[in-house]
Design a protein with these regions (language model features):
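Short, solvent-exposed beta-strand-terminating loops
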Residues: 157-173, 242-258, 538
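A generic membrane alpha-helix/interface feature
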Residues: 135, 171, 258-260, 416, ...
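Structured extracytoplasmic
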Residues: 27-55, 256-270, 278-282, 286-294
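Membrane-proximal, glycine/serine-rich, low-complexity loop/turn segments characteristic
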Residues: 1-203, 211-220, 228, 378-389, ...
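Exposed, low-structure sequence patches enriched in small/polar residues
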Residues: 80, 195, 199-255, 265-266, ...
Length: 618
């Protein structure tokens, strides 16, 4: 659902057992990704054109793949109540990872539906002080009448993880025989931080409703005498309310700061205890009207206009050496206006474009324009009855133009170890993407170009920076799927990307993902997929991770990458039960010991994961 205008698009639920086990791993989330090593740990997508737009609460960006977004909420329409249970377990003993998912949804009738889901992970981690314990829960309800429609969802997440700052010495992994202690157990490797935690809590409420204005018209099937009335929506009045509350807490218990003297040069309010607290509240409401597509033969597009109000509230520690820790507040009020042009009813040509600008408030002058066009070109033999062509090529184009102020927290921030006060310029982005795909051969080519002025990033010292020169980013992504009969499948993806200044934006020049699998059945009822998935990035100056601010910072001393990560798996499906077995990092010690994701964060060693999904329909 478009969180601004309420336009919905159909979504297909994921019921496939294919690649089930591999989907649990962090490396499968993007073609290029850095993270701190554990499941649901802080991460940064290094496939540049797959990055999400940064959140105004900068601490949430470390969990971009997992944070709540109303536009990604799925609403199910099911004749029968359904419960989907999923559980997976990885490792053993003090290194066990447990992952539980519960998803329930159902309908009272065709108009009213409800649902709720729970996602809980307790990943103890292979290395010391690296556990993660995220919890996500959401519930929704909707009503879809002939004229009035409303959707509501409430979600909360608690993303908690220990921070170890990476292992203290890269030699523990690169040259383990050089140490008398011979750190064969990663839990025994000393780390840069101890007794350190990050907690990021998010609460989100979204309510969207609309009322259709139109006429009732008689409908009938050709050759049938039955007649019924059908409502034809000519225009729609829509309105939404969105409330979001995020809170971040960075904690180093008594004595932990003393062991971190080498990491942090400053202690602005306490040398033995750190308890940084920052919060963000955002209330926004939008209202508008649109002329709907398809109410007559001349209405080939939907055209809408909207206006909205946004209020943001930031709270952080007071910049003072007094022990009162008085909270410092900042309020931002903005008025937005914009419009949308869309075309969704056609199967051959679709358009979706949205533009908005801040006309009042702190962000006045901000512009956000996005657009997407998809064209299907059919060819081949035409069906005698329907006239549908047997083949097609799909061409897609995406474009974006943004002129936006940085987050308030990029300009102003105070904590025990970091403080800054900036007056950054607006960042301008012009992005153009194109994709050509041929579904029959499972082939696609994607090209992206972005031009950036005033790029903002975090430098090697952990402080925000502005790159005053122009910068360009280019990416080429190619995907090809191959089948040999019905039993052998080979999927490949290659990403080539570069930026004009890799000291500011370092990206792996080549990233590869390859998945080779065999498909067969046992006793005609058990479907099996067995295979291996490989991930590879060329070596580059991967960023450092700063636990105190949860930001990824540039560094130019240690290259990471050039390590082939290989996972073997077996996925099975037996009616409504799916189960899998995965062996992660099968090539450990076979190729090289240099298996670092970031300078001091290595991959986890070889380990086994297994799990099951149960689909219950009442």
């Amino acid at each position: 659902m478009n969180a601004l205008t309420g336009l919905t698009s159909p979504a297909r639920p994921d019921t496939s057992y294919l690649n089930l086990g591999n989907r649990q791993s962090m490396e499968s989330k993007a073609l290029a990704l850095v993270h701190t090593g554990n499941l649901y740990s802080p991460h940064l997508v290094q496939a540049y054109f797959d990055r999400r737009i940064g959140h105004d609460f900068i601490f949430a960006n470390a969990y971009n793949l997992f944070r709540i977004d109303p536009s990604q909420q799925l609403y199910y329409n099911s004749k029968l109540p359904c419960t989907v249970l999923s559980y997976s377990k990885e490792g053993g003993g003090l290194q066990t990872n447990d992952h539980l998912k519960i998803n329930f949804f159902g309908n009272f009738n065709r108009q009213v539906g409800i649902g709720t889901s729970l996602d809980y992970v307790y990943a103890r981690g292979e290395y010391a002080e690296s556990s993660t314990k995220p919890l996500k829960w959401n519930s929704y309800a909707y009503y879809e009448g002939d004229q009035y429609k409303c959707y509501a969802n409430f979600a909360l997440s608690k993303l908690a993880n220990q921070e170890n700052g990476g292992i203290a010495d890269r030699g523990y992994v690169l040259y383990p025989d050089n140490y008398a202690d011979n750190f064969t157990d990663p839990k025994n490797m000393p780390t840069n931080l101890v007794e350190t935690w990050n907690d990021t809590d998010q609460r989100q409420f979204h309510f969207q409703h609309s009322f259709d204005l139109g006429t009732w018209e008689e409908r009938s099937e050709p050759g049938d005498t039955a007649v019924w009335d059908e409502f034809v929506p000519v225009a729609t009045i829509f309105h939404n309310i969105d409330f979001e509350h995020l809170h971040h807490n960075f904690r180093m218990d008594n004595g932990a700061d003393a062991s971190a003297e080498g990491m942090y040069a400053n202690n602005f309010y306490d040398s033995s205890l750190t308890h940084d607290s920052t919060s963000y509240r955002n209330f926004s409401t939008y209202a508008g009207i649109r002329l709907n597509e398809g109410f007559s033969r001349f209405s080939q597009f939907s055209l809408g206009a909207f206006i909205g109000y946004e209020r943001q509230h930031y709270t952080m520690l007071q910049d003072t050496l007094e022990l009162s820790y008085i909270g410092r507040n900042h309020y931002s009020n903005n008025v937005w206006a914009g419009g949308q042009l869309s075309r969704h009813l056609s199967s051959l040509f679709t358009v979706d474009a949205t533009a908005r600008t801040a006309i009042s408030g702190d962000k006045v002058g901000d512009i956000d324009i996005t657009g997407k066009v998809q064209m299907v070109i059919p060819f081949g033999t035409a069906d005698a009855e329907s006239g549908t062509r047997s083949d097609s090529i799909i061409i897609e184009a995406d474009a974006a133009l943004r002129n936006s102020r940085v987050s308030y927290l990029m300009d102003h921030y105070f904590s025990n170890h970091f403080r800054w006060s900036n007056d950054f310029d607006r960042e301008q982005q012009v992005r153009i993407e194109g994709r050509l795909s041929y579904p029959r051969t499972r082939s696609s080519v994607r090209v992206g170009i972005e031009h950036i002025n005033n790029f903002h990033y975090f430098g090697a010292d952990g402080l925000p920076r502005q790159f005053d020169k122009q910068m360009d980013v280019f990416a080429l992504e190619m995907r090809q799927g191959l089948w040999a009969g019905k039993w052998l499948q080979w999927d490949n993806a290659v990403l080539i990307q570069t930026s004009t200044d890799d000291e500011v934006l370092a990206l792996p020049n080549v990233s590869v993902e390859s998945d080779l699998s065999f498909h067969f059945r046992i006793a005609r009822t058990l479907s099996v997929q067995a295979g291996v998935a490989a991930y590879y990035n060329t070596a580059y100056y991967a960023p450092n991770y700063q636990p105190a601010t949860q930001q990824f910072c540039t560094q130019h001393s240690i290259k990471c990458g050039n390590y082939p990560l290989l996972n073997g798996y077996v996925n099975c499906n037996l009616k409504r039960i799916k189960f899998f077995l995965t062996v992660h990092n099968m090539l450990e010690d076979a190729v090289t010991n240099d298996m670092f994701i970031m300078p001091y964060y290595p991959h986890q060693s070889r380990r086994i994961e297994y799990g099951m999904i149960l689909d219950l329909q009442n």
